[in-house]
Amino acid sequence: LLKEKPDTIYLYKKDDKNYLQITVKEKVYDTVEAIFNENKHEYGKYSLNNKFIYVKEKTDNLMIDEYSIEDVNMNKLARGIFDKKDNIRVSSNNEMTDGYGILKPQGNRIIYTNPSSEDGKEVDATTAVTNAINFLELGYNEDVSYQVTTALEGITILQQTYKDSIVFSKDGSAEIIVEDNTNGIYRLTSPRRISKAYLSSKPLGTYDIERIEYVINYLYKHVELQSVDDIVLGYEKSYNKTKNTCSYVPMWYIKYNDRYVSFKSLKEAVDKGERL
């Protein structure tokens, strides 16, 4: 894994002259290598429009996993994100406010808004991501992992992660959208329900997911390759209202024109002659 195994490592922080010196024992490298070998995955390397994309090729033994779900604790969330924690009021339609920010359930999502922060100037993408993560740490820590998938001026989108991959959903219940400016976060959309306890798994059918070679060939023939930025073997998260559960179904996703769309949806649109 590592060609060189130095016994001293120096850690530097950007724009800081100070550093941390760490003495490393030889067995630490053995431990790191063992963990790496246990968790590594094989990726295929494909060229699309003169850029390389690395994709998990193995689609055998994929499972559809089912979990119980529960609602996010709105009271706990409000106490975490509101500034005026002693002045939180709840309306008849479950809308919560501290006199500045507003927190309310809406369908499968929770919407936070702060009207007093709407008139600021846009911030750059790096600042937007930093602000988003700092705000989420105040109360959006329900043991669900997310990663940033879109970073633009004033807007950050984070997708839920599952089994080392990205989760998507048609109703937005697997993503967090943060909008901010120089006055702070003024709107944040997050899932209302989260998966809790593992219930069961069943094998994915042989023909329920395409081979990566088929996906690549289809893209070459039918779409503008310069608009394709990524291909991931992700999961579609869907709810069963009758059983009050959610399922994670393996599925190919294409990042096309800066947004992720399932390969099935992309193919359906192309086959119908619809504009992507």
What does each model-found stretch correspond to?
Residues K27-V28, N73, D164, R211, ...:
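Helix N-terminus capping/helix-initiation residues
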Residues K14-D16, K25, Q106, E179-N183, ...:
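Short acidic-glycine loop/turn motifs at beta-strand connectors
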Residues G80-G101, N108, L136-I185, I231-Y260:
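Exposed beta-strand-loop-beta-strand "reactive/processing" segments of non-cytosolic proteins
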Residues M74, P115-G154, L199-K241:
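Short, non-transmembrane alpha-helical segments in secretory-pathway proteins
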